[in-house]
Structure formats: C-alpha cells, structure tokens
C-alpha cells in the first residue's frame, strides 16, 4: 500500500549504517551517525487519517493502536530523550543504529 514510504525508510536505515561506517573509518570516533525511527505521532500531516472530527479513532487509528503494545500514539516530546541520548557522551560508542521510538510497534508480531 505504501511502497514509496517503505522503500524510503529502508533506504534511510541502510544509508545510516553505511554513513556510520564511512565516517568511523575516516574520522574514528569523532563523528557518529545514528537515526531515530519514530512510530505513530499525531500531527498535521496524519491527524485526519487517525482521528475523527470528534477526537475518536478512525478505523486506521484503531488498527495502529491494536498493534502498538503501549496502546497509544507517541507525544512529540518523547523524541527528546532518545535524541539527547544519541547526542550525548553516554552514546560515545554507538554508531550505525536506527533507534525505534514507537511504543513497541516494530517489535510486535500480533501474537
């Protein structure tokens, strides 16, 4: 259903890994390359797809929540912690990862 979107996400993940290797080989630990993979966050772009006018979930919104172990959408502020971690000295030996911030959506198999 969303071939272009899926292909672009896969490309970004592979690019992140490739760039991490290239930068580490050229600059050692001076440049780290990581990414975050946000799950479902309600914003202007998707609000009408996920919420009805009265604020209840659309069919698509319900399906997403059913497949998100934390049973909710993310809040934009919840991206701050993972970003700060990846930029901090605590992640000084972390490079080439794509960190999901998705309430467990990517880990859930529906079982």
What are these regions (language model features)?
Residues 1-7:
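Active-site loop-to-helix junction immediately N-terminal to the catalytic Tyr of the SDR YXXXK motif
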Residues 8, 16:
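Active-site helix of classical SDR
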Residues 21-26, 92:
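Alpha-helical segment proximal to the catalytic Tyr-Lys
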Residues 27, 32, 94-96:
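Short, small/polar-rich loop/turn modules that mediate ligand/substrate recognition or access, typified
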Residues 32-42, 87, 100-102:
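Conserved SDR Rossmann-fold cofactor-binding beta-strand/turn motif
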Residues 40-68, 78, 108-111:
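A glycine/serine/threonine-rich, flexible loop-to-helix segment
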Residues 79-80, 86:
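Non-catalytic, hydrophobic alpha-helical segments
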Residues 83-84, 95-111:
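Short C-terminal tail/terminal secondary-structure segment
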């Amino acid at each position: 259903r969303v071939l272009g979107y899926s292909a672009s996400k896969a490309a970004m993940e592979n690019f992140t890994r490739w760039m991490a290797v290239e930068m580490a080989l050229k600059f050692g630990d001076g440049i780290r390359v990581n990414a975050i993979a946000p799950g479902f966050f309600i914003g202007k772009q998707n609000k009408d797809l996920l919420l009805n006018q009265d604020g209840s979930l659309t069919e698509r919104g319900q399906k997403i929540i059913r497949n998100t172990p934390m049973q909710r959408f993310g809040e934009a502020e919840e991206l701050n912690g993972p970003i700060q971690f990846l930029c901090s000295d605590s992640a000084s030996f972390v490079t080439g990862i794509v960190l999901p911030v998705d309430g467990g959506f990517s880990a859930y198999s529906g079982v």
